[in-house]
């Protein structure tokens, strides 16, 4: 196993970002609950600890505090924002409410570079988010940097290798922030950079073989990035012991079923079973217009269809899943609990426990960007590795109102035009998502000398990093005009195309 950096989570919304930045430096990181016993961290062999930020004051009645014994483990520690205040509080310093709170952009002046700031310019732009500040240094510490309102924006205890910073190096707003993290990992902790795609694949293949033995593994394949990479990794490990089940729910994009069949059956030679349940899904969705009800019907029907499909496949001991690392982190309200608490992941897509299948989740240690790297290394085509997110209920949440075969056909054809033009123009891989939405509204149009009364299609194209926030993409007007012209001319039943220019928040990316 690779060397591990422990990230203790104290409720920061940026905890996952810290973990990702560490991995970008080819060092393995793992997020732990803030109260994780020091003994556990010692047993798991962590070579360094990062204390995350958090929304609380260290003096608050229910403020999250770590096991004090972590400071006796003899490993380097880096405190970020709330984390540096914890270090001050526990090690004999003093924390106080700042007279001028620091939020947003700020400026850092480095006084003593030391190992943390080695090789960096003396002055840097940083990103702040704190109301408290360190007012008195703990014994053994020295100030290394200052900001506008903090005389201790950077501190260090070289003997114990404890470092603290009163800003967020993990966000892109902080200039050279990743270099600071890298300095801590390599220069202070002595990390070997042994977390690579090649090494992960080798370890994952060995783990899958050890766990599965000669047993059969069933994987629900959607054609999306996560399930595709999981399928490729499982197949590399156990070959013919893997059977994939693809459910055609009638809510797929144009040509999707044929594409999946060609890719996995013919290219990867995976045992793929395709179940056509499109008529059943549409029958159960008939007359339903409420979004949440549609989602529940689609979810329940999928579970039922998938369970029946498994009976035709034959005996299997394991169910494979494309679970990712963010999936095993449960978001909870801030209070005495952190924003991200590691939990045992039991979400198997709603599949009944009576199936008594054990889980194999080969991607559960990875973030999305790492999954894409693994997919590329396993030989998956670019259009799969970099495929845009697609909702679980499929086009069912992109048809407003009742889902009918006719409405789906209109949406499917319009979406295909948008996809073609986004690919041809080179914008497909530059945006987070681009798709069409069918609106059950008829408007007056003119074709030739005849008046028409046809439907409206909305274009939704957004830019984002993690889907938590998003902004509408400013595509060239000429491209938008061409897309609109093609849809209204080539897709029967559409007379008007509109553009959604809403950001998230307040709008969500999907319409339902």
Curated annotation (Swiss-Prot):
Residues 195-387 form the GMPS ATP-PPase domain. The keyword rRNA-binding does not apply. One of its GO terms (cellular component) is cytosol. GO terms for molecular function: ATP binding; GMP synthase activity. Its EC number is 6.3.5.2. It catalyses: XMP + L-glutamine + ATP + H2O = GMP + L-glutamate + AMP + diphosphate + 2 H(+). Keywords: ATP-binding, Glutamine amidotransferase, GMP biosynthesis, Ligase, Nucleotide-binding, Purine biosynthesis. Gene3D superfamilies: 3.30.300.10, 3.40.50.880, HUPs. Pathway: Purine metabolism; GMP biosynthesis; GMP from XMP (L-Gln route): step 1/1. Homodimer. This is GMP synthase [glutamine-hydrolyzing].
């Amino acid at each position: 196993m690779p060397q591990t950096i422990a990230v203790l989570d104290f409720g920061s919304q940026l905890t996952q970002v810290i973990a990702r930045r560490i991995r970008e430096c080819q060092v393995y990181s793992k997020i732990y609950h803030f109260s994780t016993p020091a003994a556990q961290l010692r047993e798991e062999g962590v070579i360094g600890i990062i204390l995350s930020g958090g929304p609380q004051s260290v003096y608050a009645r229910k403020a999250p505090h770590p096991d004090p014994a972590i400071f006796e483990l003899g490993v380097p520690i880096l405190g970020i924002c709330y984390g540096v205040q914890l270090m001050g509080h526990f090690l004999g310093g003093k924390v106080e409410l700042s007279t001028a709170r620091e939020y947003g952009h700020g400026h850092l002046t480095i006084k003593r570079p030391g190992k943390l700031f080695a090789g960096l310019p003396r002055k840097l732009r940083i990103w702040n988010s704190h109301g408290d500040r360190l007012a008195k240094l703990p014994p053994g510490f020295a100030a290394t940097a200052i900001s506008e309102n903090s005389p201790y924006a950077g501190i260090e205890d070289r003997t114990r290798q404890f470092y603290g910073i009163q800003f967020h190096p993990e966000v892109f707003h902080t200039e050279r922030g990743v270099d600071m993290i890298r300095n801590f990992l390599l220069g202070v902790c002595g990390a070997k950079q042994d977390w690579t795609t090649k090494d992960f694949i080798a370890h994952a293949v060995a783990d899958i073989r050890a766990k599965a033995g000669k047993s059969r593994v069933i994987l629900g394949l959607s054609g999306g990035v996560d399930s595709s990479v999981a399928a490729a990794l499982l197949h590399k490990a156990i070959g013919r012991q893997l059977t994939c089940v693809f459910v055609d729910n009638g809510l797929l994009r144009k040509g999707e079923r044929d594409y999946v069949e060609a890719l996995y059956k013919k290219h990867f030679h995976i045992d793929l079973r395709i179940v056509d349940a499109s008529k059943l899904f549409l029958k159960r969705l008939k007359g339903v217009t409420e979004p949440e009800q549609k989602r529940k019907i689609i979810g329940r029907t999928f579970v039922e269809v998938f369970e029946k499909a498994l009976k035709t496949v034959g005996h299997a001991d394991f169910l494979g899943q494309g679970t990712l690392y963010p999936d095993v982190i449960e978001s909870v309200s801030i209070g005495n609990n952190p924003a991200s608490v590691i939990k045992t992941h039991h979400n198997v897509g709603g599949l009944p426990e009576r199936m008594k299948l054990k889980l194999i989740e080969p991607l559960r240690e990875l973030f999305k960007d790492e999954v894409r790297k693994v997919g590329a290394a396993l030989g998956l085509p670019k259009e799969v590795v970099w495929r845009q997110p697609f909702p679980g209920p499929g086009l069912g949440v992109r048809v407003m109102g009742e889902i009918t075969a006719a409405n789906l056909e209109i949406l499917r054809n319009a979406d295909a035009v948008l996809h073609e033009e986004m690919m041809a123009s080179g914008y497909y891989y530059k945006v987070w998502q681009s798709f069409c939405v069918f609106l059950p509204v008829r408007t007056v149009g003119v074709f030739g000398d005849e008046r028409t009364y046809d439907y409206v299609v909305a274009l939704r194209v957004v830019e984002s990093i993690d889907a938590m926030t998003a902004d509408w993409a400013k595509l060239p007007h000429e491209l938008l005009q061409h897309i609109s012209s093609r849809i209204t001319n080539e897709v029967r039943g559409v007379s008007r195309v509109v553009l959604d220019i809403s950001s998230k928040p307040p709008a969500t990316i999907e319409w339902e």
